[in-house]
UniProtKB/Swiss-Prot annotation:
Any single Gene Ontology cellular-component annotation: plasma membrane
Listed InterPro entries: ZIP (IPR003689), Zn_transptr_ZupT (IPR023498)
PANTHER family: ZINC TRANSPORTER ZUPT, ZINC/IRON TRANSPORTER
Protein name: Zinc transporter ZupT
Cellular location(s): Cell membrane
UniProt keyword list: Cell membrane, Ion transport, Iron, Membrane, Metal-binding, Transmembrane, Transmembrane helix, Transport, Zinc, Zinc transport
Species: Chlorobium chlorochromatii (strain CaD3)
Reaction it catalyzes: Zn(2+)(in) = Zn(2+)(out)
Designated gene of the protein: zupT
A GO term, aspect molecular function: metal ion binding
Length: 268
């Protein structure tokens, strides 16, 4: 059991720290390529949608059928899915749009900024870090519990969320870097925002460990699927189309689905 806990936590840490990877990519890149970002965001959406609908929803239903029976299991699976959508939509609603990391135009040329603009960018970057931390908290718990219940599923979710977190790291680091001209500050704040995932995993584990059961895991899986679909449709795909052509975004989605389908066939 201890090995399972450590493995699940390692997956969560991996997913969370990918925010720092996104920050590094943005800070070290000499030239912004919108096509690459468009394809990457589409790829992330494809991975998340495919994993959510093909893998996670199936696991949610299987767990709930074991826990509460076939008929109620089906109903609770669907309810859990939409509960996850409602939860992440509520979080988005509570965060004003200018503070939402997915609303930032990181492609904008900001080299020449006034002092007021720099202050605004710094505030935007800090709010983005907090917003991403709030988003990452339930994602961390979801990754951890998935890894604890089913290591293969946990890996799939961790990879999907890690890919999703990379552009978020860029969203935090870009405005902070342009405001301070400090790569170090931009990276540290982006890195810290990603640590919300392992923190969410630890807090969730200590609060819920006495309630672990197939039913609980099923509800969590259903909610995770809803969260991942919402993020893909509400955040990743619109952002992908904002930075590039529609066909590049859709190509990224299909590529993400193909890659995840092949990986699931090979490793499950």
């Amino acid at each position: 059991m201890t090995d399972n806990i450590l493995f699940a936590f390692a997956l969560t840490l991996f997913a969370g720290l990918s925010t720092g990877v996104g920050s590094l990519i943005g800070l070290l890149s000499k030239e912004f390529n919108p096509k690459v970002l468009t394809i990457s965001l589409g790829f992330s959406a494809g991975v998340m949608i495919y994993v959510a609908m093909i893998e996670i929803m199936v696991k949610a239903r299987e767990s709930l059928v074991v826990g509460i029976g076939a008929e109620m299991g089906k109903v609770v699976t669907v309810l859990s899915f939409f509960a996850g959508i409602f939860l992440i939509a509520l979080i988005d609603k509570l965060i004003p749009s200018y503070e939402n990391p997915h609303e930032l135009n990181v492609a904008q040329k900001l080299e020449e900024c006034s002092e007021n603009q720099k202050k605004k960018l710094m505030r935007m970057g800090l709010f983005s870090a907090v917003a991403i931390g709030i988003h990452n908290f339930p994602e961390g718990l979801a990754t951890f519990m998935s890894g604890l219940s089913n290591p293969t599923l946990g890996v799939s979710i961790a990879v999907a969320i890690a890919i999703h977190n990379i552009p978020e790291g860029l969203a935090v680091s870009a405005p902070i870097f342009y405001a301070t001209q400090s790569r170090k500050k931009a990276f540290i704040l982006s890195f810290l925002s990603g640590l919300a995932e392992p923190v969410g995993a630890l807090i969730g584990y200590f609060l819920l460990r006495s309630f672990f059961s197939p039913s609980l895991f099923g509800v969590v899986f259903g909610a995770v699927a809803g969260i991942m679909v919402y993020i893909s449709l509400d955040e990743l795909l619109p952002a992908a189309e904002e930075y590039g052509e529609h066909h590049f975004a859709i190509g990224g989605v299909i590529a993400g689905m193909v890659v995840m389908a092949i990986s699931l066939l090979l490793f499950t």
